[in-house]
Amino acid sequence: MGAAGVLIGQGFDAHRFAPAGSGRELWIAGLYWPVPDSCSEADAARYEGIEGDSDGDVAAHALIDALLAAARLGDIGSLFGVGADAHGAGRHGIDMLQEVVAHLASNGYTPASASVAIIGNRPKIGTRRAEAEAALSAAVGCPVSVTATTTDHMGFTGRGEGIAAIANALVEKI
């Protein structure tokens, strides 16, 4: 542990978009991304949800892994399980994130700062960046910055097949 008792962790998550007509809602960074009223039927597929055992919120899931890694408390799979019968099945990522913060506290850690980079072509995160930062910061109890980038049409995110996120978090021993 560092001299100041500050530890750093990194997390990553990726999910494919659900097939059109699946009925999955799109949740990213604790926010629901509805299909805009002005959206054409052809463009509505951009707002199809994300496949996953939970809501597939890659930002929340990457942040969970970063926080757990910093405190050396495992990862999202070791805490919530995987598959349809897992403790995290059907849950919102933001709720899981709040549970992780409580788990950190019960083990003597508190989040100090975090950042999440969302990687994908859709939806356009910048239009709701402030909301995303507010939602994640409220859940974690510390400042969380949110950035977004595309991959210039490279890889599965560039082809529009899915979305990913990388997160870094600082936690302090209390």
From Swiss-Prot:
Signal sequence bounds: none
SUPFAM superfamilies attached to this UniProt entry: IpsF-like (SSF69765)
Pathway annotation from the record: Isoprenoid biosynthesis; isopentenyl diphosphate biosynthesis via DXP pathway; isopentenyl diphosphate from 1-deoxy-D-xylulose 5-phosphate: step 4/6
Keywords (A to Z) from UniProt: Isoprene biosynthesis, Lyase, Metal-binding
Reported cofactor(s): a divalent metal cation
Binding residues annotated for 4-CDP-2-C-methyl-D-erythritol 2-phosphate, in chain numbering: 13-15, 75-77, 149-152, 156, 159
Functional description taken from the UniProt entry: Involved in the biosynthesis of isopentenyl diphosphate (IPP) and dimethylallyl diphosphate (DMAPP), two major building blocks of isoprenoid compounds. Catalyzes the conversion of 4-diphosphocytidyl-2-C-methyl-D-erythritol 2-phosphate (CDP-ME2P) to 2-C-methyl-D-erythritol 2,4-cyclodiphosphate (ME-CPP) with a corresponding release of cytidine 5-monophosphate (CMP).
Protein name, as recorded: 2-C-methyl-D-erythritol 2,4-cyclodiphosphate synthase
Species classification: Bacteria, Bacillati, Actinomycetota, Actinomycetes, Bifidobacteriales
This enzyme's EC code(s): 4.6.1.12
Lyase as UniProt keyword: yes
Site (Transition state stabilizer): 53, 150
Cross-referenced CDD domains: MECDP_synthase
Keyword DNA-binding on entry: no
Swiss-Prot/TrEMBL catalytic activity: 4-CDP-2-C-methyl-D-erythritol 2-phosphate = 2-C-methyl-D-erythritol 2,4-cyclic diphosphate + CMP
Domain of life, source organism: Bacteria
UniProt record, GO biological process: isopentenyl diphosphate biosynthetic process, methylerythritol 4-phosphate pathway; terpenoid biosynthetic process
